[in-house]
């Protein structure tokens, strides 16, 4: 249901972008994301999936005629809007899901996934905090999942630390 709701607003915003109109995200969409973030009964892995915006490729499948520039612009704008609207919630969930040691267990995998989803949104939020969180996670990562999530977040959000992270990773 959440993905269907998102698809509707993504299509609407791609059309608005193409017409030079301002993009919109109704309050109830952010509220739905907030409810997922704060619901302690949802498996963290499932929450991470629900909170992840569709990829540009998935969005392109919604259209007969594909406008990649509009799709990327809308996806980034929605990410930034959600990052701003839910900054406190993303940060709280990010911090609450820090693990002491790497273990290959379902519960830990889910927490890592949710934490990394939150990091990606946080990367599109307040720049100084984003740069600090991403750099810290990259340097403290004891597994490839967390290191790559930090690297991907820095690149996607075009953070100042992205070049250093990319050089360190190669």
Predicted features along the sequence, with ranges:
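Long, ordered, helix-rich scaffold segments
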Residues: 2-167
